[in-house]
Amino acid sequence: MIIFNLSSYNPGPFILVGIPGLEQFHVWIGIPFCIIYIVAVVGNCILLYLIVVEHSLHEPMFFFLSMLAMTDLILSTAGVPKALSIFWLGAREITFPGCLTQMFFLHYNFVLDSAILMAMAFDHYVAICSPLRYTTILTPKTIIKSAMGISFRSFCIILPDVFLLTCLPFCRTRIIPHTYCEHIGVAQLACADISINFWYGFCVPIMTVISDVILIAVSYAHILCAVFGLPSQDACQKALGTCGSHVCVILMFYTPAFFSILAHRFGHNVSRTFHIMFANLYIVIPPALNPMVYGVKTKQIRDKVILLFSKGTG
């Protein structure tokens, strides 16, 4: 049944359809989503625990890594539990405030993730290009200011999205063909001009993320120049190994993100079912893989994980 809203600026609940075209498979689709979500939660919680309790991990790089783990937890938790309730319980309704809250945390943590990866790139740049000045440049005070700065920047970028939606009148169907609320998807249900919503909601966050990518690329260009200028091959391999996990996480974050964004904007031949499925995988797979990547590629974390589980079985 099509649900219409006649209350203009005070809309009733929205209906989240799930994954269009695959409704009959929702119960089965929920199983791998649940497993991957549990892996993401457990992996990031272990990572946070190790960074907090192990004094040897109280370094700038691991501080930013703990921020990444926290944002990954929030990102996946903002979307996956509601998706599972749709898949398994048929709980499709979401209130307008609940929709805005979910949208804010999903978009906020996406932009914050990008900023954290940029900060981690700068950390690697200082560690490799100016190792003797590392502790004087990245002081605890500087790290805290950087963390607060990127968090506040992300907040300021995403908060207008919420405000713009609250200014729209809704007098059309309130059915959203998705498993979670996202800015443009909700704005398209309004019976008013959404040009501002489109240009701000699409262009500003994307330009912000692109600027982060450019700064990351510049940092790694300097890093590569410094690495290939090292006198010994062992030192070169060690320096590249230090950056390996970060590069893997960068590729896992930005590659599907830009693919999803471009497919949504220009991929008119991409089916809605594929796009929604891909968007759901994006909020759960990178958060699940990031702890594994750092656990495998970062010796300090790998050793602490082995020690933790050896104590548990001993």
Swiss-Prot record:
Source taxon at top rank: Eukaryota
Glycan-carrying positions: 5, 269
Chief localization: membrane
PANTHER family attached to this UniProt entry: OLFACTORY RECEPTOR 52H1 (PTHR26450:SF123), OLFACTORY RECEPTOR 56B1-RELATED (PTHR26450)
Disulphide bridges: 99-181
Keyword Magnesium: no
Protein name: Olfactory receptor 52H1
GO cellular component: plasma membrane
Purpose: Odorant receptor.
Any one Pfam family match given in the protein's UniProt record, by short name: 7tm_4
Gene3D superfamilies for the chain: Rhodopsin 7-helix transmembrane proteins
UniProt xrefs under InterPro entries: GPCR_Rhodpsn, GPCR_Rhodpsn_7TM, Olfact_rcpt, OR51/52/56-like
GO molecular function, one term: G protein-coupled receptor activity
Transmembrane parts of this sequence: 33-53, 60-80, 102-122, 150-170, 198-218, 243-263, 276-296
Positions in the Extracellular compartment: 1-32, 81-101, 171-197, 264-275
Protein topology in the membrane: Multi-pass membrane protein
Compartment(s): Membrane
Keywords assigned by UniProt, alphabetized: Disulfide bond, G-protein coupled receptor, Glycoprotein, Membrane, Olfaction, Receptor, Sensory transduction, Transducer, Transmembrane, Transmembrane helix
Cytoplasmic side of membrane: 54-59, 123-149, 219-242, 297-314
Gene this protein is translated from: OR52H1
Similarity-based family: Belongs to the G-protein coupled receptor 1 family.
